[in-house]
Amino acid sequence: MSQDPVIIHTDGGCRPNPGPGGWGAVLRHREHVREMFGGEAAVTSNNRMELTAPIMALEALTRPVTVHLYTDSTYVRNGITKWVLGWERNGWMTAAKQPVKNVDLWQRLQAACARHQVEWFWVKGHSGIGDNELADELATRGLQEAVGLTTSSAGTSLR
């Protein structure tokens, strides 16, 4: 695994929730920066978009690396660091014996994390953290493009 971590900031959301949604991610490694975004024109949820962002970012990495992943979603951070192993052990049922919501994405995130050494961090959203703010802007762009307010429905840009 790489000694210099890849730093990833992610965000996702919907307008309204549920409704069309977008996700964004900023990946940094040394002097390299990659911006990613996408969206869903169909009805989705904030939580699904918050999960999609780290999945897409981790799946974009071409080799196993150390990752510091920042999210403003306690749902995502707690889910992957505290709850997912119990859900899996219980047949993807919650402690209340209800099916886990978004199980398809939790399983995909779990698989994406397995390729890398991922350390998860929670950050307060809209608090002036540059790459978190950029991930939010990218999620908005993904939403706008998904509903046809701009030209395409998913993209990647390099800075």
From Swiss-Prot:
Q: Name one Pfam family in it.
A: RNase_H
What keywords tag this UniProt record?
Cytoplasm, Endonuclease, Hydrolase, Magnesium, Metal-binding, Nuclease
Binding of Mg(2+) 2 occurs at: D11, D136
Location in the cell reads: Cytoplasm
Q: Where are the transmembrane segments?
A: none
Q: Which GO terms describe its cellular component?
A: cytoplasm
Enzyme class of the recorded protein, top EC level: hydrolase
Q: Does the keyword Hydrolase apply?
A: yes
Q: Where does Mg(2+) 1 bind?
A: D11, E50, D72
The protein's matches in NCBIfam families, at most eight in alphabetical order, are given as: PRK00203.1
What's the subunit arrangement here?
Monomer.
Task: Give the protein's recorded name.
Answer: Ribonuclease H
